[in-house]
């Protein structure tokens, strides 16, 4: 059976696992209808528009 010859260092193990530890930050862009910051590719929470079309009717 194969056995590792040397103990892997902390930096090597942590470098390998670092891809799973990255935080995903949502991307924001300005809404084309109201100018509010909204998450990309999502309906604007303030006005209910996405790509110049109204998808939600919000009572303001």
Swiss-Prot record:
KW Ribosomal protein (keyword) present: yes
Pfam families recorded: Ribosomal_L32p
A Gene Ontology BP annotation from the UniProt entry: translation
Keyword field contains Cytoplasm: no
GO molecular function: structural constituent of ribosome
Cited InterPro entries: Ribosomal_bL32, Ribosomal_bL32_bact, Ribosomal_zn-bd
Tree of life domain: Bacteria
This protein's GO CC annotations: large ribosomal subunit
Disulfide bonding pattern of the chain: none
UniProt entry keywords in alphabetical sequence: Ribonucleoprotein, Ribosomal protein
Similarity field: Belongs to the bacterial ribosomal protein bL32 family.
HAMAP family reported for this sequence: Ribosomal_bL32
Name of the featured protein: Large ribosomal subunit protein bL32
Species of the source: Borrelia duttonii (strain Ly)
